[in-house]
Amino acid sequence: MAEKYNPQETEKKWQDKWAADRLYHAGEDSPKPKWYSLTMFPYTSGNLHIGHWYAEVPADCFARYKRLNGFNVMRPVGFDSFGLPAENAAIKHHIHPRIWTLNNVENMRRQLKTIGAMFDWDREVITCLPEYYKWTQWFFLKLYEAGLAYRAKAPVNWCPSCQAVLANEQVVDGTCWRCETPTTRRDLEQWFFRITNYADELKDHDGLDWPEKITAMQRNWVGKSYGAEVSFALDCPAAPEQEIKVFTTRPDTIYGVTFMVLAPEHPLVEKITTPENKAAVDEYIKKSRACTEIERLSTEREKDGVFTGAYVTNRVNGHKVPVWIGDYVLQSYGTGAVMGVPAHDERDFVFAQKYDLPVITVIAPPDYDGQPLEAAYINEGVMQNSGPFNGLPNTEGKEKVCDYLAEHGWGKKTVNYKLRDWLISRQRYWGAPIPMIYCEKCGIVPVPEKDLPVLLPEDVEFRSGGESPLKYNEGFVNTTCPVCGGKAKRETDTMDTFMCSSWYFLRYTSPGYDKGPFDPEKLRYWMPVDLYTGGAEHAVMHLFYSRFFTKALRDMGIIDFGEPFKKLFNQGIIVSNHQKMSKSKGNVVTPDNLVAEVGTDAVRAYLMFVGPWDQGGEWNDSGLSGMSRWLNRVWNLFTEEYTPQTASAEAERELKRTLHQTIKKITMDIERLRFNTVVAALMELSNSLAKFKEAAAVSAESWQNSLKTFALMLAPVAPHIAEELWANLDMEYSIHNQSWPKWDEELAKDEVITLIIQVNGKLRERLEMPAGISEDEAKETALNSTRVKPHLQGKTPASVIYVPGKLVNIVVK
């Protein structure tokens, strides 16, 4: 056995052997229960950073633990490889996105292997390869067949200087990322998925073990609101429409409406605007189109608008109210029109003050004296100035007003959602082509399944304008209609990259299957994912889209389950000097350098020790060095010869108790994903074992068994050194095929406990007592303590409270 531990040599040796033996390949013929462990796959940016390791390592530790506990564990790996960065690299470095991406895959694959994770590399998927995106296109066709994919006009970002469409990612602070010209908005035909059809299901997380912050974010993203749709009479000869509809969550305030605001994009704006107001309205619309939705909805931005010159009539009281346009109203939410009730809405109150619009109080605050309000009153109260509803509590009035509106045909109860359909069109090259064809005779025609995949052409010219090169590639664009055989053109938009990541977890179950996107039997065996780990930033994108996708496939009969991920865990982030790591700050930690310096296992153990996994922690080079030294001490603990001296029954009992207590603690902590305390417990155990070794009072057999137990618990944390130590104990290969140690509750019990004695909640004594002490004995001992008696002042205690094995609290009045 080597005298000094060489981590790099040992780690490479075992990584090579594990790979050659396909140790971590998981099949479907195992009698063991399955466990599907998955971490969100990385984007092919080129290099793994320490954040990738922090996502992977604790998840790998848990997967290894499950394997040792008798589970058939699948832990696949792959690469999210379509997207805008590859296209930007093509322009910047004059290299094809495919070459840039696959070079990055090769490098990142090498880096991932150094983690020493139990990845099943037989299951690797790369989303930019035709054998993968063929099925992405197939899913698009299935969604189209089901009526869930449709084409409609939608606003896009436009750079007037480049004369090009820009992706949202290419707009920086409202300007073009290349020329810094202020961007505007234009309407273009785009492809959407009807994710809104699943709004109610997507806000329901029953049966899922997910963080509350994620489920709350998804519920808020869906934004379900109960209210009423109300119609206001429109008297405008230029508009054939006779009314404008609004959605409101406050029908109880309908009598307080003093203005209406339409979104600048509302189809009625052009029709109802009077000639004298047209110039101002047109200028305002032009200005609003230069703003992103985020800017328009910002709570910090002052709300403004322009009067159209038109009026509508509030049918409940006959009041004529002016119609304005304002960019804080979005056409895509509700009806694209809102009623202004300044007395009871903070935003409306500010708007009314700015433009000197009336404020009518219709919900009276407590002790209201009839004076004008100094701010919007948004709480509950009694209805006033509300016709037949005067004197009603407004909570009751909501229901009655809705009934009144429905009775007169002026409105109805309805439910509204903030959620909008998923726009999947991208005007770029490096994505899965949308498999649709446009024929002058037949219209929009889907590509036949037998003709999939629609391949990305290799001979493309990358332009800096922001438009897809596919648009100018005649060999790609020009095709024949599959229905009539006439001349036709292909769709030149590609799909949002989130489309690829919305089903990759399904492909992992049978990545080589070529008769469909997955083998139904293997899918049935593995899905759903038992533990999914990754960043919380994906709450309302990837995680949301994956759930929609799964539910849609279920409804199409393609799969038989509706949720992809049983348990979700979001890791925190590793920071340096209390700052998030970034290249610009020069504080990025490169794992390759760390592995070369101290080895993989030291990096793994330190990452798990640095802080609670869900919170992250502060990177510290000295902490990593300390972890390396600890592993060397563990190595010495195993390799330095043990020679028992005098046998001691007490030492044997204490060793067993120490081992069984540690097994219990580590098992419970791993189950709770508390890896920092797992590593701390291993450190404490190694220190205890060192003392037992020095005392040499336990038998050689007991010592050997303690080392085996320690190695097994070390294996998920530091798999390479654990494998080496196991081999050096002459144990059967591999340690990762063994069984996790079990604790005996009796052996784990302390013989002596520390009993806290309090009087009226104040600490008065600590007593070392036998672990099996009864309640009566504990109370009697506490009452007779010489340190406690003076605080009782000769009085009989009102009560004596006993917390078993921990505390006695004496209450004296």
Curated annotation (Swiss-Prot):
In terms of domain of life, where is this protein from? Bacteria
Q: Does the keyword Aminoacyl-tRNA synthetase apply?
A: yes
- Spell out the InterPro entries in the cross-references: aa-tRNA-synth_Ia, Leu-tRNA-ligase, Leu_tRNA-synth_edit, M/V/L/I-tRNA-synth_anticd-bd, Rossmann-like_a/b/a_fold, tRNAsynth_Ia_anticodon-bd, Val/Leu/Ile-tRNA-synth_edit
The stretch of residues making up the signal peptide is none
Positions with a binding annotation for ATP:
583
Keyword Cell inner membrane carried by entry: no
* One GO MF term: aminoacyl-tRNA deacylase activity
What EC designation does it have? 6.1.1.4
Entry's Gene Ontology BP terms: leucyl-tRNA aminoacylation
Q: Which catalytic reaction applies to this protein?
A: tRNA(Leu) + L-leucine + ATP = L-leucyl-tRNA(Leu) + AMP + diphosphate
Pfam families found in the cross-reference section: Anticodon_1, tRNA-synt_1, tRNA-synt_1_2
Motif 'HIGH' region, residue numbers: 42-52
The alphabetized UniProt keywords are: Aminoacyl-tRNA synthetase, ATP-binding, Cytoplasm, Ligase, Nucleotide-binding, Protein biosynthesis
Subcellular location per UniProt equals: Cytoplasm
Instruction: Tell me a GO cellular component.
Output: cytosol
Q: Where is this motif: 'KMSKS' region?
A: 580-584
Q: Which NCBIfam families match?
A: leuS_bact
Name of the protein this chain belongs to:
Leucine--tRNA ligase
